[in-house]
């Protein structure tokens, strides 16, 4: 009888401990710091990108965040006047972008499971550096200047977090960007990353 009570007591204590550990994985008042890599999708094809972000769990559901991303190449289209031609021509080219923005993750805990879906919305600035581009216009290679630009952009999307334990986790996210300014083409990114949860 004592052995049975001992086994039952250990099982109950183990369940309580597991419940407490699971419940404490998704908690308010913690920071998440992490990096990510993925692919960006512009007007033509996908390209590698990466970045990092920091979130703060104001509550178990609301996480304000800041994020930096670098896109080595985003496709763009533009109508330009070419020397020697009497009419404007449409050109396509790739240019690197940097994105810095803030927003909020809306986390949706499901019965304290370690897998947590979330939505995201943000607003910030996208910067394209000044550079020279080479384009082919009617069989002729032409070098054109591209001015630097910094424009506001909104973004939205969603993803999944998986909390490996109370300290570490991984996440996958998909997001669309809508820039303002001269280049208004919507582009997106799909990313996978890790994070460290700090209290």
Named regions from a protein language model:
Residues 55-138, 190-199:
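Gram-negative (and chloroplast) outer-membrane scaffold detector with strong preference
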Residues 29-31, 46-50, 94-100, 115, ...:
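Residues that define the transmembrane beta-barrel architecture of outer-membrane proteins
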Residues 31, 61-66, 112-114, 162-170:
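Repeated loop/turn-to-beta-strand initiation elements of outer-membrane beta-barrel proteins
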